Amino acid sequence: MAPRDSAEPLPPLSPQAWAWSGKFLAMGALAGFSVLSLLTYGYLCWGQDLEEEGSLKAQVDERPEAGTAGTSQPHLIFILADDQGFRDVGYHGSEIKTPTLDKLAAEGVKLENYYVQPICTPSRSQFITGKYQIHTGLQHSIIRPTQPNCLPLDNATLPQKLKEVGYSTHMVGKWHLGFYRKDCMPTKRGFDTFFGSLLGSGDYYTHYKCDSPGVCGYDLYENDNAAWDYDNGIYSTQMYTQRVQQILATHDPTKPLFLYVAYQAVHSPLQAPGRYFEHYRSIININRRRYAAMLSCLDEAIHNVTLALKRYGFYNNSIIIYSSDNGGQPTAGGSNWPLRGSKGTYWEGGIRAVGFVHSPLLKNKGTVCKELVHITDWYPTLISLAEGQIDEDIQLDGYDIWETISEGLRSPRVDILHNIDPIYTKAKNGSWAAGYGIWNTAIQSAIRVQHWKLLTGNPGYSDWVPPQAFSNLGPNRWHNERITLSTGKSIWLFNITADPYERVDLSSRYPGIVKKLLRRLSQFNKTAVPVRYPPKDPRSNPRLNGGVWGPWYKEENKKKKSNKTKAKKMQKKKSKARMRKQLAAHSSIKCHPSVATG
């Protein structure tokens, strides 16, 4: 499905600029490549030890797959990791061991030009609606636990569309798309079953979350009710995997299945079972060590999900998609090296994600896709694979990219609106003048058109954070890799193809390109809906809801309130009518001539 309008073609970077950028990149990134090569060697050595020790034990028996005849529609398995950094996978050179992810990706299609959003709610909303944030009103930040806000109810969700063509739809894991009303819950947005958390984070064992002092509650749900039976200290990654196995064990593989598994890992708080620390004692940075253990547990979980797909007869007709929801957070153990920036920013480190597709149904297995892909593309792609229909009047921002992935064809996508956030205007020096009268550069925005990427406003923390496993590089950053944003700057231009690490700002060199991208931003902004970011509601406090985070907005209260309002209006009308009668009565009395009237 095409976006609302097409982008203007932009000229390529000149050969001289390519050469100039290449020299700059070579000097700045050489050390990074040597580090990556060392880590790759260490990972390969560890992989041999892993096979010998058998430390990743399956929780289900590996046995030949049963027949799966009976449906031409594939089973769709979407696995979403939380806060996994771009570098935090073995095949990107990480020191963290991810043999399952490496194997699945190597046998499938690696997505090496794949983009998501910089934080949780936006990525999840775009996956489930196929629309940019500016078209759902979720442009600003995330949905907070105490906000009366959720994914707009007038947006048809992916599971709703899949149910129309006969799919059973199940969600396991983190929702984070709002819950203040019952209509906002996953089971009301297209999922037959839901087992997971409603908030953005929480304790992995107790499943409790405090949003602020005194505002704490339990956050684990079975469909529409608190899952108190699981208040027993089970680590969420393992608990969610067990639920996935149960779903697969009880579902008929001849009937199409959509399974959305949104793991809590590797989001903070940094917690993991003790045995996963075994191979990471040498990592000095404690947050990195804990993060590594969490990621190893996640890798094992996906291993067990894959085995269950095979055991219960789903695998041969399944399409498995793996994605992170945003970049890693270096202060919480994640790494996006050698990309610039982190989670919460519009630099490449915040929005370029780990992603791959694994399936026996792929035509080009064992390949790398470098075509432009965005998280909104999964919506039309999966509906098309499911033999579903998208209404012509629904304007999506995603494209069907299955042929791009499976057959290696060119991507239909030429641009990505990373976001326009009119509320976030922290760039003190931004102005209309800086945007050539086309755009107010105080506004945080980012757009990609072909090779070019433009950022305005304050894009967020902009450092390159090196691998934290190496203590000699310093506790926080490698000083040679740090660049401080220029004072007064509110606009940047990069050629991402030539300069994927965003080291060479070309905004002053190519003002014509800047103007074209600013016009494109302006075009997108004309289609934006108002931002939905309401103030917190004190009724959301779990203490008022049995100690549980959950829907607090009661429809019956609304009716009572409306009835009271009507009664008050009637009283006012009666009162006004009485006053009018009294005034009329007084006006009919004639004044005595000797009585002064003025």
Curated annotation (Swiss-Prot):
GO terms for cellular component: actin cytoskeleton; extracellular region. Residues 559-583 have a biased composition (Basic residues). Glycans are attached at residues 155, 304, 316, 429, 495, 525, 563. The modification 3-oxoalanine (Cys) is found at residue 120. Ca(2+) binds at residues 82-83, 120, 325-326. Its cofactor is Ca(2+). The conversion to 3-oxoalanine (also known as C-formylglycine, FGly), of a serine or cysteine residue in prokaryotes and of a cysteine residue in eukaryotes, is critical for catalytic activity. Transmembrane segments: none annotated. Its EC number is 3.1.6.-. This is Arylsulfatase J. It comes from Mus musculus (Mouse). The gene is Arsj.
